[in-house]
Amino acid sequence: MVSIKPFRAVRPNSYDVDQIASLPYDVVSKSEVLKLVEDNPKSFLNIDRTDVRFETEDADEVYELAKDKLADFMDKGWLIKEEEPALYIYRLLQGDRLQYGLVTTIAVADYADGHIKRHEFTRPDKEKDRIRHNDCSDANTSPIFLTMRKNSKLKFLLKKERDARLPLYSFDSFNDTNHCIWRITDPATIENIQS
């Protein structure tokens, strides 16, 4: 089984979450990003796609600006750092399509040891870009998505957590998608989910 751990997230405050939410960095063109960040200074693309402001996409300045933009968002209170480690339940609702996920950290060793199967082949230049971006900003700004086999126990635990509290966020964003997120901080519950 893959090891998962809670983490201290840097996340949007509740008031700005719908403005900060953005499309994944790799599904929008340079011209689309420029328009989106011009129209919305709170868009997370201001951090995730700083390359659009430079002639050379992999210049050191690209990654330094990402680090500076992340600090600026935090200084302005648009992004806040969690006090304690947490797991997050993430629900996406688009039309009649409903998906649930668990936001967590995983061990790279689980991938190296074959416990996580590769589902796509990524371009080495894009991998290098994201590694530099994460290293320089000291943040994972582009999480990866994993899928897993059906797990009735986990499904039950996550439903119980959703039913026990109001979500941290519930907002509509791009593509008519509703995003709903619950935070789990109770150590016993986290341990139960990890098992």
Q: Where do the protein language model's features map onto the residues?
A:
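A cross-family signal for N-terminal binding/gating loops and helix N-caps
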Residues: M1-Q194
